[in-house]
């Protein structure tokens, strides 16, 4: 809801839901909580300086198993924050990001097992902060083209068999990858 510049975050509750958002323009905000066990979401953004902040089951009520989320954007200086489930309850989640533009920031905190997180990012000065936790078999793949990037990737599971791949083409940047399958602490 938006009235004269004021914004109220949405709150969607239910066992299973499908949400399709097509947002066009600059300086928009898409903020809210989703409480559902299975979410199918298509989020398309075309514009600059937009903000996307979503929490899926932040109170650990339903989980977020079998969710299929697609985030696509064309534009620059956008900020994306996604917190998906707690306690590895986003089992078999399929999360796909396609980002085209410069100076975009993705901050994703995903608690999953047997789930995938694929990011395809094209543009300069983009930042990715990914924290993937869960029991086992988390799959993270980042395919990036562009200069001056910043990646901070943490993937930790209780058991093992996680998979992580980063392919990046361009000049300059900072990359920190920590992967730990229940063993010793790691750091950059």
Where are the regions that the model predicts?
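Low-complexity repeat regions of mature extracellularly deployed or surface/particle-associated proteins
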Residues: 1-188
């Amino acid at each position: 809801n938006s009235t004269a510049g004021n914004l109220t975050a949405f709150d969607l509750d239910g066992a299973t839901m499908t949400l399709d958002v097509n947002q066009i323009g600059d300086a928009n905000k898409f903020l809210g909580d989703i409480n559902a066990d299975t979410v199918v979401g298509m989020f398309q953004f075309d514009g600059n300086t937009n903000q996307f902040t979503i929490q899926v089951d932040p109170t650990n009520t339903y989980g977020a198993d079998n969710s299929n989320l697609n985030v696509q954007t064309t534009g620059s200086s956008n900020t994306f924050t996604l917190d998906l489930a707690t306690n590895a309850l986003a089992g078999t989640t399929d999360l796909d990001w396609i980002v085209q533009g410069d100076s975009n920031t993705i901050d994703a905190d995903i608690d999953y097992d047997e789930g995938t997180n694929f990011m395809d990012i094209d543009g300069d000065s983009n930042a990715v902060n990914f924290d993937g936790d869960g029991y086992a078999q988390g799959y993270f793949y980042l395919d990036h083209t562009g200069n001056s990037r910043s990646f901070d990737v943490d993937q930790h599971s209780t058991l093992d068999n996680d998979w992580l791949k980063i392919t990046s083409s361009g000049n300059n940047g900072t990359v920190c990858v920590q992967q730990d399958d229940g063993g010793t602490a790691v750091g950059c």
